[in-house]
Amino acid sequence: MLEVEVESDNKHLVADELIALQSIYPEIHLDGNNYGRLNIPVNTESDYFLSFKSPDESTLTDTIVVRHFPDLVMEFFLPEAYPFNSPPTFFLKSSWLPLKQKRVLTSSLIKLWNEIHDCVLFDAIEHVRSIATIAFHLPTEMVFPGGFDDLKKEILAFDKNAKLLEFQIRKFQCNVCFDEFNGTDCFQLTRCGHVSCQSCLRDYYTMCIQEGMFSQIKCIDLDCGKDAPVLTLKELESIVGVQLTNRYKELEEKRRYENDSNIIFCPRSFCQGPSKRDPGQKLAICQKCDFAFCSFCQATWHGDLSPCKLEGDSKKLVEMYLNYQENEPEKALELEKRYGKRIIDRLVEQVKNDEEAEKWVLLNGQRCPTCDRVVERIDGCCHMNCLCGTHFCFLCGAYLMEQNPYKHFNDPVSSCYGMLFASAAEKQRFSENWT
């Protein structure tokens, strides 16, 4: 009869203990009166440096720094003789805690019961929770053998998520607008840790992208200063979204290409893709749309043997070529490759002939201001009447009134005053002084 009463008292004590645990730890899982399971958070106040070896364990491949580890699962089984005559059976489950530490910790829990021979579950749980804050006495620097990449990923992901949850429940003052926000409305930069509200960062970085101020896409806190590195693409996307980030990548890539003298852009207006060319080579192929074109004239590819079609002012081209010949011979050779040396030589000769002809016209003739026809005066006065019907001055080329063409020569203010019958020599002197 006595044994039955003792067994009944034990059950009541265990039931009361489990009810108390349920109220203290609502997240605990209990199964009947003899089994329980509880996740113990492992959030430390110190940084832990975890190094991982290569598969052959010859080198260290990576080192991570964390403060949060995946939960330790604490299970207990209560025998019938508990709490006075038999201790609980404890099982500690963890993907990262070494087996040696698990055994030491389990032994310490049994020792707690040995000291009192009574209900010990609360003390056991609190003991585990207290030393969890120091990662169960593990050193702050640990080395894992090869083959633990999955564990590294698990710890990193857990630590990142735990830090995010901590961040979201805190309050922060934005260093731009100085208002206070919940962490859920803020963003913390990875490199420096500075925090600003999402609205201010989004507005600022959007403006930087739209205005092409790519070097300013970095931390805006004054402590970081002008030498702060630009944001990572992942951070930028978290703030301004995918569309603007893609636009930034396109513009930044184009700017980088524009600074490369060997990069030219597709002449198709709808493409504008980059193409890398070898110096001196005509053929260029767009990396975006595969369009083949001439790197010199931007026209559809016309072959190495066909010269580029000459467009624009040939005189400017000749001036450029002659200047290159004197100062930058390699650029003169590039023009010869583009248009062909014979064509360039012919243009040089033509421009020189045109200049000589223009000099003769300047000294010996005059162009009609209406039709540009060259008029030569053999004899007579300086009042010219062109075939197109225009009256003009042979000396200065000015229009003359048909009703009174000689007023121009009788006006004291006119540059041609008194020179109605100027000689050829006087015409040359006039041209040298007034043109």
UniProtKB/Swiss-Prot annotation:
Q: Which residues bind Zn(2+) 2?
A: C192, H194, C219, C224
Q: State the EC number(s).
A: 2.3.2.31
Gene Ontology molecular function, alphabetical: ubiquitin conjugating enzyme binding; ubiquitin protein ligase activity; zinc ion binding
Stretches annotated zinc finger (RING-type): 174-224, 368-396
Q: Name one Pfam family in it.
A: IBR
Which residues make up the binding site for Zn(2+) 3?
A: C266, C271, C286, C289
Annotated pathway: Protein modification; protein ubiquitination
Q: Where are the disulfide bridges?
A: none
**Record PROSITE patterns:** RWD, TRIAD, ZF_RING_2
Residue spans, zinc finger IBR-type = 245-308
Quickly give the catalysed reaction: [E2 ubiquitin-conjugating enzyme]-S-ubiquitinyl-L-cysteine + [acceptor protein]-L-lysine = [E2 ubiquitin-conjugating enzyme]-L-cysteine + [acceptor protein]-N(6)-ubiquitinyl-L-lysine
The positions annotated for binding Zn(2+) 4 are C294, C297, H302, C308
Binding sites annotated in the UniProt record for Zn(2+) 1: C174, C177, C197, C200
- Region annotation TRIAD supradomain: residue ranges? 170-420
Residue limits of the RWD domain? 16-135
Domain remark text: Members of the RBR family are atypical E3 ligases. They interact with the E2 conjugating enzyme UBE2L3 and function like HECT-type E3 enzymes: they bind E2s via the first RING domain, but require an obligate trans-thiolation step during the ubiquitin transfer, requiring a conserved cysteine residue in the second RING domain.
Spell out the protein name for this chain: E3 ubiquitin-protein ligase itt1
The species this protein belongs to is: Schizosaccharomyces pombe (strain 972 / ATCC 24843) (Fission yeast)
Gene name as annotated: itt1
